A protein has these predicted regions:
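Non-catalytic terminal accessory segments
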Residues: 1-30
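Short, functional N-terminal and low-complexity linear motifs
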Residues: 4-6, 16-18, 37-41, 70-74, ...
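Alpha-helical transmembrane signal-anchor/signal-peptide segments
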Residues: 28-44
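Soluble catalytic domains of enzymes that build or remodel membrane lipids, polysaccharides, and related
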Residues: 45-200
């Protein structure tokens, strides 16, 4: 009947479309693209080469070895500063991968350092026993590898520009914590200097 034929046709179309959709999703999730921006400002900051990345979701996308290779590629860009704006790890990142990735970050050579602010996945949604480490353990490992962790903090770099690292919104919305407003974070800053905001 026509009804059965149209159901079969819908099934024949739905299955390949689903496969294509999942394949494209996997490809986009597992590959990294470089996007370059040049910003011009009247502020007296001079030239600054910033490399920023987010949403690596180590363990879901690639593991520690893959992340370390990407850090080698970032090093070739000769950044003045590296900014990691959240979801570096998530609930499926093993402790071994987390440590290996923090060590890879610690090997980066930059003029002004590496800075990290939290995303909604970094501290984990489950009990720390699920992945073998807590948000505090992640902070300790990052800091051990000379990564500066910013949680509603502002840093003046070389008297040239500011970096503001915001607490993730999930801290306030899902975990009952506090997140400072931009007004609070910028009220004492010199407006003649360039400001970079890290906000997942």
């Amino acid at each position: 009947s026509k009804k059965q034929a149209s159901k079969c046709l819908a099934g024949f179309i739905a299955v390949p479309l689903t496969v294509v959709y999942l394949a494209v999703g996997w490809y986009l999730c597992s590959n990294v693209w470089e996007t370059d921006y040049t910003l011009k400002t009247d502020k007296k900051s001079g030239d600054i080469r910033i490399v920023q990345f987010a949403d690596s979701h180590v363990g879901t996308t690639f593991h520690g070895d893959g992340f370390a290779k990407y850090m080698e590629e970032i090093q070739k860009l000769d950044p003045d500063v590296v900014l990691i704006t959240g979801d570096f790890v998530d609930d499926d990142t093993s402790k071994e991968d987390m440590i290996q990735c923090c060590e890879a970050l610690g090997k980066l050579k930059t003029k002004y350092g590496v800075y990290f602010s939290f995303g909604n996945h970094d501290k984990g949604y489950y009990d720390p026993s699920y992945r073998g480490y807590s948000g505090d353990d992640l902070i300790a490992e990052l800091e051990k590898n000379n990564v500066n962790v910013l949680q509603d903090d502002t840093v003046l770099i070389d008297d040239r520009f500011y970096i503001i690292g915001r607490q993730d919104r999930s801290e306030e919305m899902e975990k009952g914590g506090h997140r400072a407003s931009m007004e609070e974070l910028t009220k004492d800053l010199d407006s003649s200097k360039f400001t970079v905001v890290m906000d997942h």
